[in-house]
Amino acid sequence: ELFFDYAQETGAKVAVYRFPNLMGHSRPKYNSAVSTFCWAVANDEPFTVNDRSTELELLYIDDLVEGMFDLLENKEKHCEFDGVETVLKEDGRYCFVPLTHKVTLGEIVDLLQKFKQQPITLMMPKMPDGSFAKKLYSLYLTYLPTDKFKYTLKMNVDNRGSFTELVHTEDC
């Protein structure tokens, strides 16, 4: 309320955000379950998920930065809140970044396990642009030790030549 009062009294522009859980590279085993899971899976460390059905609303750090650029260009999104739910409202007092992802802990861990198995199965989950999977994969790679970036590929050779499969997708 102090900021809103200040804006009212001075005419200054004030932008108040209430962010959901942020997701980006951070110290594992500190304050981010997602970073901890990424680090643990990438480094073969044990971890515990108490309830796979627990849902998180996550905002990826790159999307947060994009939202801040929108604010600087006067393109921010406004809202009000109904409890913790964001209600889009053009003349709302609050601002928000609309690119969030609601996912369960189980979905996060399952995706991370698929990423970990990719060098063995060559199977890559669907990762459309802007998807949670693509953002999680980008984060996972930041925790992957450099020696795990390379792996042996099988070359198929016959009288026609050679062929090496690098990756499979679920659709092909």
Regions found by a protein language model. Give the residues of each.
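A short glycine-rich, His/Asp/Glu-containing loop-to-beta-strand
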Residues: 146-172
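Substrate-positioning beta->alpha
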Residues: 28-36, 53-74, 106-110
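Mid/C-terminal beta-alpha module of Rossmann-like enzyme folds, strongest
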Residues: 74-155
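Conserved catalytic-site region of short-chain dehydrogenase/reductase
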Residues: 22-26
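Phosphate/oxyanion-binding loops and surfaces in catalytic or ligand/nucleic-acid-binding neighborhoods
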Residues: 40-47, 70-78, 111-119, 166-169
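Active-site Tyr-X1-5-Lys
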Residues: 1-16, 32-43
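A conserved pocket-lining segment of Rossmann-fold NAD(P)-dependent short-chain dehydrogenase/reductase
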Residues: 16-21, 39-59, 79, 88-98
